[in-house]
Amino acid sequence: MNEITLMSFGYVFGAPEGADTVIGTRGLPNPYWVEELKHKTGLNQAVRDYVFSTPEAEAYYESCLDMLRRRIAFYERYDSPLKTPLRIGIGCTGGKHRSVSMTVRLAAALEGEGIPIRVLHRDLDKTLEHSAGAVVFTREAGEPRFVILSSVFGNPGFPKGHIEAGESDRDTALRETEEETGLRVRLLPGFRAVNVFPLPNKPNTWKQVIYYLGEYENQPLRPRAGEIAEARLLPYEAALSALRFENTRSVLREAKTFLDELPAASARSGGH
């Protein structure tokens, strides 16, 4: 029998190269949002129990197992001098909880049926920090003006912060925007941008920031003292030039494209 590998991975770190089949697990219950489980991994039984705690999750596992049985049977029947090892990627957001749980359980079931499995957990040693924020704008003479904040450390960007226990990412975006700018914004439906980048001062640590698009009217900017050195309201091109990092510029470009394609009446009708 040729080598068969099941590899867990995190989508934020990229899909695994050379995977013949990829199984997604992002629809399963996520232990990250359970305080006593978030710092554990899918190698822990309590985490696996949580991931497969619903009838839908159990049914999805069974369908994945059945699919792999058929995929492996087809692979074993295939005869060619160019035949390569079979690689199955199993992904979730960060590669620590759901994908690892599914990989462990599928591998155990297949090995119990006499199928040797090589198991790899590609991103288990990586840490993913979760934050959320908003690209905040108002309209002047029909054109958007964007709020650009400069922290006391000098890095210009958008209001954002860590997602607290019990918060949704939208809740965090609203809270952080009000705390850092003094603005109560309306999140426009349909926009969600994700920014992922490594933290240079933390080995094997990445940050994922989910951005929404927040609109406000007739409110003064009140930047948070001691944290925000400057808050500017800029037209698009000036805002783009003010941002130093390409991943942040990319979020602003997405927001501007979204606004350009959105009728003004629809933008004004958005809600929390």
Show the residue positions of the predicted features.
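Catalytic cysteine-centered active loop of the rhodanese-like fold, especially the PTP/DSP P-loop
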Residues: 81-108
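Unchanged
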Residues: 161-253
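Extended hydrophobic secondary-structure segments that form protein cores and membrane-embedded regions
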Residues: 87-92, 120, 148-149
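N-terminal strand-loop-strand
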Residues: 127-159
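C-terminal accessory "lid"/substrate-recognition subdomains
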Residues: 1-86, 113, 123-125
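Hydrophobic anchor at the start of a short beta-strand
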Residues: 116-118, 132, 185
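Charged phosphate-binding loop/patch that engages nucleotide di/tri-phosphates or the phosphate backbone
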Residues: 119-124, 241-272
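Post-Walker A helix-loop "phosphate-sensing" segment adjacent to the P-loop in P-loop NTPases
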Residues: 107-116
